[in-house]
């Protein structure tokens, strides 16, 4: 939910969100109520781009780099084009990105998308600056409530005929969080059980409760059709 009392630090096309978690979102398309077909949600860091945006050292370098210097993981840009275009190559299937990267590096990320010809319908950034301002330092690296909240905000708007395909990596917890999201959408994980699951993963209690409250606004259905995870960790946990 946007708070109109917040200062307008972001350009008009970006939505400042404070609940269920601080984030900044840009939506460029609303799907018609009768839409029936696939939609795709992608992570960015280590799923599309070979970067570490979510780590402090990586984030600090981004504003000083050129978008052309950022490297996509092999094959991912072609895959994004194919998913977007569909079999007819002109379907413009819905494509969204959710990233724990902070909004201040959005220009570098979106410029890279422009260079690579990647059309997208929405992108959500974790508002790390607001989290820091709130002195919730443990939430800077803990992404559970952010990612579930961002996903549920999208799910609430998807038409009933949407079939969701999700792409992430194992550098963090994408597989687990995507599975939790699938269970939330299907009605298998709601209420106090959802709050406890988030807190056990490190989410703050008040964020966990806000995510659980948002989940009640999402109609129960089997929304998620497939989850694809890029394996970047070694068996011993190394990267």
Regions found by a protein language model. Name each.
Residues 1-42:
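Non-catalytic pre-domain segments flanking phosphatase-related domains
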Residues 38-51, 178:
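Asp-based phosphoryl-transfer active-site loop
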Residues 42, 96-97, 165-166:
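Structural recognition of the beta-strand scaffold that forms the well-ordered cores
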Residues 50-70, 185-203:
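A solvent-exposed, charged loop/short amphipathic helix patch at secondary-structure junctions
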Residues 51-54, 61-63, 67-73, 97-118:
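A metal-dependent, Asp-based hydrolase signature
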Residues 65-93, 103-107, 145:
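Short, acidic loop-to-helix structural element flanking the phosphoryl-transfer center
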Residues 86-96, 158-163:
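Short, surface-exposed connector motifs at secondary-structure boundaries
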Residues 101-239:
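C-terminal cap/substrate-recognition subdomain and adjoining C-terminal extension
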